Amino acid sequence: MKHAAWPLAALLALSLLPPHASAQDTPLRFNFASQDKPGMQAVRWRADGGAPLYDAARGYGFVELTNAQPARPVHTATLRQDGKAVLVSEPAFDGDNHYGLAFRIKAAPGAYAIGVRTTAGSEDATVSISGMQTSRLLKASTWDAAGLLPNRTPMRVDGHQWSFRYVNGQPFIDVELEPNRTGTPVGIEEITLTPLPAEDRPAGSLPTVFTLGDSTVKSYTFDEAPMSGWGQVFPRLFDAARVKLVNYSNGGRSFRNAYAEGRFNDLLLAGRRGDIVMIQFGHNDESEDENARWGRGALETTYEHMIRNVYLPAVRARGMVPVLVTPMSRVNGTQKAGVPYENSFRKRHFPDIMRRIGQDSGVPVLDLNARSVEYYNRTGVPAVTAMVMSIEAGETPGKTNDGSYANGHPANKIDGTHFKEAMSKQYARLVAGEIERLAAGGDTTARQLGAMLRTDVRAAIQSGDWSGIYPEIAADIQDGDKAYYRNQFEKLVQLGVIQKDAQGKVDPQASMRTAEFTAALRRLLGLPAGALASYADGELTREAMGAILADAYHARFGTRPKYMTDYNGKTVVPGMPGYDPNLDSGAKGAMYYPLVDWSKLEDTAAVAPAYAARVRDAYQLGLIRSENGIVRGRMVNGTLLEPKTGVTRAKAAKALYFMWVLGQPPQAENHTLTTAAK
């Protein structure tokens, strides 16, 4: 499919991009042997027998502090040359710092193929480039939760030869070598840096907008439902015939560790000239581990250094276009009604730093931080709290890093940092609005981005009426107490199993009819038309709902889905597949199954005999739980089943959403609009 012509402003912006990746045009080759080698720069020891220290005028030499953040001490005084290589041996290590050596090479921003020949293999030595975490780069990995985005630029080791493609943003590159064992000499024989030019986009291919950020931007899977990131739903606002969007975000990431693990590097090597890179970090940068080698946290000076001296120069050197997004304010999970929301960045003022850098460097800044606080105060505490990760028992079979959500949030709090899809769509809308705001002010990059938005999205931004973009947002679930199950209603309306009335409402407090409930359940689980037909229509009661859920479950599932088994009371720990140190909370896994045994419920005798066995089955399967005494933000179960109580449309939506997630592939992205229909 041909895409529409770009506007003149976008073409002019492309014409101003740098002509190639780096001012360094020819390969740099360094020889650490005492004998000269053709075409290589000999690294000679000083007259006093010491190793040559870095000299910017000369363009190379050893350093005592690496360019990592924080800088890592290494050694120069103990380096020696044995005629074949430069060697280092360490009598002791300091935690994860194995010291070793760092050879600095003057190299302009741009991409390089780096080759390092060592005296020892990877069992004895580790090579790293400019503070990157080689242990992460040696493993086959993907950058996203669904496993759709593989790392295409790993560190490769072939015997004693190490190879890595690296995009540099600083005026030099550090080649680091650390011994893996004390008392074991390791060394470097040769280093080669070969410039890699920025690549043009193939003719006829679409431009790409990359999003890079933390858990608030990430694309989530069904096993993490209902959590969502704005980068996951952002593509919905764009014209797919004009642009593609790729989300490199993941939880636990900051400017520091997204760089160190190679995420940022791989994005830059995947991109082409003229592609746009939207970057949002700040929440994990608040972590108070700024002195840890592989930490997430940053002081304000480090945060500014990473943006100014690492990220922006590297993006530009690849001919790509940077856009900064200020991190949204965290929501206070205990916010009291009537008290205005305030910006959560009160200790480390990262959004202010990002705004200043944007102004100084001519980089557009989309101020999601400011817009988020405005949105919270317009919307009000009940609806905002409902849209963040406020989870009660029976709301979702998904999990967090601490275990199952099925009995409520395992952290026993309302998590105001993370949020449901109902909120991620609002953040995406606010980001799009910021694009149009900057475009109206004459920013050429914002105009380029704005031209890629859907025409109706641009109209919605101008009018303030988003009902055509998000028709699933019913008129009566947007604020107040009726917004409590807003996320569930939005998804069920999207899926076509709950209908809005002529006034655009879903009437959450009205009674649910049995026929509507069974029809919705059949469609969500892909059951045949005749399934659940034995239930007569009328106002749905909890005991009837329990029996229906049990019948639907057994009609759909031959074996228990992974939500009930793999994620039941388990926490991923080091050594297990999928373990990510950036997401390790140290907590024990929470259970999926009800915390209160069936025998401990106080009113089971009131269940009609015709329903009793199926209701018990549904309860023990975790498909229906007590609604009495449960609280969002706490892992708690009640002791009353209330079998004769009528089911509101809101409570029915809660149960239907739970069953929909239960029927989805755990590792599929959870914004997918799919039922289990076969």
Regions from the language model: what does each represent?
Residues 380, 461-678:
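N-terminal propeptides
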Residues 1-7:
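Bacterial N-terminal signal peptides that target proteins for export
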Residues 17-24:
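Sec-dependent signal peptide cleavage junction
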Residues 24-220:
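Compositionally biased, intrinsically disordered or flexible polar/acidic segments
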Residues 265-421, 425, 429, 433-438:
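Alpha-helical cap/lid subdomain in secreted, periplasmic
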